[in-house]
Amino acid sequence: RYDNRPRGNPETDEGMDQRNGLIILQKTKDLMQYLYTSWVKYPKSEKPGFVADYKKILLEFLKYIITAQKKYYKKTTLQDADVQLELLRLFNDLSYDLKFIDEKRYLLISDRLCEIGRLLGGWIKSQKEKS
């Protein structure tokens, strides 16, 4: 169930981690769909290298988010996810610099990555407050 329905008790923090994870998961899924349509337009010569690495980082990020949802101690997993998010930003910048994507696509992907970053940052902050 990867939807935005609230779970747990809103009066307390119960279920807050699950909601954060589900929202980030949904936003990442939306980003994946958009990136997959973008990668079709990349030069054929870049698909086995650059695009494959980009996909690997995206899937690794997704893996960390799913893992963090399932773990009791989430802080290090979320920090690992944050590193992967930085790599996604770097690959987006490179895609634009190498002219694989136009400015409109670059800005749209950047906005989505920033939104995911804000959500992830809030989740990390909530974990630091717990410890």
Where are these regions (language model features)?
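Amphipathic alpha-helical assembly/interaction segments
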Residues: 1-131
